[in-house]
């Protein structure tokens, strides 16, 4: 890790269809091997399926899904006197969003539907209704932090 300069945040452009920066970040996270057009087709296709199934605006479903997945606290390892404690710490807003996007994509990839569009739309709908494995991951993270609340005085 460099001690001299902090890396600058890169500017990203909003996506062409909705004009939303979070959707662009989501597309970039889904993208494999630099194939952005494939990632766009997956995301926009999933949004179309979500709109057809839920009769709601896909962007609101997407944002509510991310809000339901994003963790508020997580545990970090802290070594104190030969023992390693799992210390609960609050999650910064940028990290909350990044974790939510990462967990949503991982949960969608593990699903059993045939195409990624179906998997992603199913996980988005589940997450917006507080179901699904991405929401379970958030609950597990919160339980872990709650169980280790006794070590919260080791924060840094």
UniProtKB/Swiss-Prot annotation:
Claim: Hydrolase is one of the keywords in the record: no
Keyword Signal assigned: no
GO terms classed as biological process: translation
Cellular component per GO, a single term: small ribosomal subunit
Lineage top rank: taxon: Bacteria
Pfam family name, one: Ribosomal_S7
Keyword terms, alphabetized: Ribonucleoprotein, Ribosomal protein, RNA-binding, rRNA-binding, tRNA-binding
InterPro entries: Ribosomal_uS7, Ribosomal_uS7_bac/org-type, Ribosomal_uS7_CS, Ribosomal_uS7_dom, Ribosomal_uS7_dom_sf
Gene3D superfamilies linked: Ribosomal protein S7 domain (1.10.455.10)
Gene Ontology MF, one: rRNA binding
UniProt family annotation: Belongs to the universal ribosomal protein uS7 family.
Function comment: One of the primary rRNA binding proteins, it binds directly to 16S rRNA where it nucleates assembly of the head domain of the 30S subunit. Is located at the subunit interface close to the decoding center, probably blocks exit of the E-site tRNA.
Subunit note: Part of the 30S ribosomal subunit. Contacts proteins S9 and S11.
Name of protein: Small ribosomal subunit protein uS7
